[in-house]
Regions:
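Short alpha-helix plus adjacent loop in nuclease-associated cores
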Residues: 120-140
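Short, structured loop/turn "capping" segments at alpha-beta junctions
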Residues: 115-118, 188-189
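Conserved protein kinase catalytic core
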Residues: 15-17, 127, 177
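Conserved non-catalytic scaffold segment of RNase H-like nuclease domains
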Residues: 2-110, 116, 146-153
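Acidic, Mg2+-coordinating catalytic module of metal-dependent nucleases/exonucleases
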Residues: 92-99, 103-108, 135-192
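Short, Lys/Arg-enriched, disordered terminal segments
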Residues: 1-2, 192
Length: 192
């Protein structure tokens, strides 16, 4: 059995949160395949997902190169969900902050969320590594993905130059390298 884990990342059209729930929907989803025997991270799939309710002033459009028009012309979420269900059913999947990605998937693509086997959360596992910065805006927090990547991957295999792109596939690949480093340190264990 090949030791593979799929890393999923979502980007959303969120403009604000109400009682811990974001108002947006998934507008981009990226999946990277991590092979723990070959120590590789490869792009698997990426989709721009249609969200007719998206606001042109959403954070994602103002802080990345993803455009409002791309999302308006994106793939129907049901088509994306069905494709990824077929590819990922029964596979081990993880994310950096599973609680967020799982919440978004549960709302927008529930069948996909329920057909995968969630592995260990990369954010929680990264918090066990001494030295990764845990302060953001002056507050103690969970380590941010880019801080974990910069600390664990000083050779910068994704050529990010210290800055997370906030594009789903790019971030999934970055998080895949975090997974490899956690695995090397014995901080990520495959589900059997």
């Amino acid at each position: 059995m090949t030791k593979e884990v799929y890393v999923i990342d979502t980007e959303t059209s969120t403009t604000h949160w109400t009682e811990g729930i974001p108002n947006g929907h998934i507008v981009e989803i990226g999946v990277a395949k991590v092979n723990l025997e070959k120590f590789t991270v490869l792009p698997a799939w990426k989709f721009i997902v249609s969200d007719p309710s998206a606001s042109p002033s959403a954070w994602i459009f103002e802080n990345t190169d993803l455009t409002y028009d791309e999302v308006m012309e994106g793939t129907n979420p049901l088509i994306v969900s069905k494709f990824l269900e077929d590819k990922l059913k029964g596979k081990e999947v993880t994310a950096y902050n599973i609680a967020f990605d799982s919440m978004m998937l549960d709302r927008d693509m529930p069948y996909l969320n329920n057909c995968v086997r969630w592995g260990q959360d990369l954010m929680i596992q990264s918090s066990k590594v001494p030295g990764i910065p845990r302060k953001h805006a002056g507050k103690d927090t969970w380590p941010r993905a880019e801080d974990s990547y910069n600390y664990l991957c000083p050779k910068d295999p994704c050529n990010l130059h210290g800055k997370e792109k906030h594009r789903a596939l790019d971030d999934a690949e970055m998080e895949g390298h975090i997974l490899l480093e956690l695995f090397f340190r014995g901080l990520y264990t495959l589900k059997e």
